[in-house]
Design a protein with these regions (language model features):
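Juxta-kinase regulatory segment immediately upstream of eukaryotic protein kinase catalytic domains
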Residues: 1-25
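Surface-exposed helix-capping loop/turn segments at secondary-structure junctions
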Residues: 19-23, 86-87, 157-168, 289-295, ...
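ATP-binding pocket architecture of kinase catalytic cores
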Residues: 28-180, 184-197
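Active-site acidic catalytic loop and adjacent metal/ATP-binding pocket
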Residues: 33-45, 52, 90, 155, ...
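Short beta-strand segments
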Residues: 59-60, 91-92, 217-220, 237-238, ...
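C-terminal/domain-terminus segments
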Residues: 163-182, 298, 302, 313-315, ...
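Active-site activation/catalytic loop segments of kinase-like enzymes and analogous catalytic loops
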Residues: 250-291, 305-324
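Helical subdomain adjoining the active site within ATP-dependent kinase catalytic cores
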Residues: 295, 309-353
Length: 353
């Protein structure tokens, strides 16, 4: 669908859902940043009934998304919101692809802006603005760490049983959120899509399971771009596709892998410095997880797992002929992941050409 098709079809869908045939947009849908595997639009409606009366977000997945994706994310976010965590409440979790060309969520739009959003200017502004931001990095770093740590600590403190009960009551089997289930899905994808060059990572992860600590609710993609704040106050955490019940190192290891590997577009002179700063941020943030040898082994393990997930995502995309550009869907992105796994394990991974 084109953007215009989505805008028109969304309004038709909402008129049906609300039984308001004259429903109209107050703020027409416009694209928001992020969402490498989804189209994200912000909008609002005129004189709409609750719960559609406030600022809204459409999160539209690709047609190839699994049938359980929208219900799963909706159940996760609503359970967290009901337990007092700042996840956006979901008002519609549509599994069918017919209305908009893919499954989708309609949810509340959280106030605030992305934590550390000033860093985005490094990739879109000139050298003068870049140097100005570099002078502000110590302040930005302190603010990012404070809000990031708060969001992470609060999530890991959410009672797992209460969360599991709410997710189950929404019709989502809680066992589907376990790390074992998530890992099994990655193993299956490797075989289904002929990604034999990733089997060494699967074998390594199977043979090197770390000593387990108490399971908590994990986000799975908890970099600061998924954390929102307003005037120094945490207001929201978004993008729950990788939510998993696992030990805390699952989240911290994922962040370490992401900040070590995600491609960054910056002037050549600041690339190395920015990468070092990102790695330092991740390492500092991960200290909340502990510094014992067992913790270090777990962080290493979940870094490798996160890289495997990213590589599988790229491999699936290529196998399905999907040209949508994701964060790692480039030669540089794949090379960063492969090199990081080699650094951690000595393995040499490959993806089909």
């Amino acid at each position: 669908m084109t953007h215009e098709d989505i805008v028109r079809s969304l309004l038709t869908y909402l008129r049906s859902v609300t039984a308001c045939p004259d429903l109209a947009y107050d703020e027409a849908p416009t694209r928001m940043s992020g969402g490498f595997d989804a189209t994200i639009l912000r909008f609002s409606l005129q004189s709409a009934p609750d719960p559609f009366s406030g600022p809204l977000v459409l999160r539209l997945f690709q047609a190839t998304a699994t049938a359980d994706r929208a219900p799963r994310e909706g159940a996760v976010q609503n359970a967290l919101a009901q337990l007092g965590y700042p996840a956006p409440s979901v008002f519609v979790a549509e599994a069918r692809i017919e209305p908009l060309g893919g499954p989708f969520l309609i949810m509340e739009r959280m106030p605030g802006r992305i934590v550390g959003s000033e860093l985005e200017n490094l990739s879109i502004k000139g050298l003068g603005q870049t140097l100005n931001i570099l002078r502000q990095l110590p302040r930005i770093r302190r603010e990012v760490l404070r809000l990031w740590d708060e969001a992470q600590t609060r999530l890991h403190a959410v009672p797992v049983k209460g969360f599991v009960d709410l997710v189950a009551s929404a019709g989502v089997p809680p066992e589907n959120l376990s790390f074992d289930s998530v890992f099994a899905a990655q193993r299956a994808f490797v075989e289904e899509f002929g990604l034999s060059g990733l089997r060494p990572a699967v074998d390594w992860l199977t043979a090197n399971t770390p000593r387990q600590s108490t399971a908590v609710i994990c986000h799975g993609d908890f970099h600061s771009s998924n954390v929102l704040a307003d005037n120094g106050r945490l207001t929201g955490v978004i993008d729950w596709v990788k939510a998993t019940i696992a030990e805390p190192a699952f989240d911290y290891g994922a962040v370490m892998a992401i900040l070590a590997t995600v491609p960054i577009r910056v002037p050549a002179g600041v690339h190395r410095m920015l990468r070092a700063m990102m790695n330092n941020l991740a390492r500092t943030h991960s200290r909340q997880c502990g510094t014992t040898p067992e913790t270090e082994a777990a962080l290493r393990y979940y870094q490798v797992f996160n890289c495997l997930v990213q590589l599988v995502t790229v491999g699936k995309s290529h196998a399905q002929g999907n040209t949508t550009q994701g964060a790692y869907n480039s030669p540089v992105g794949v090379a960063n992941l492969v090199n990081h796994v080699h650094l951690l394990t000595g393995l040499n991974l490959t993806l089909p050409g």
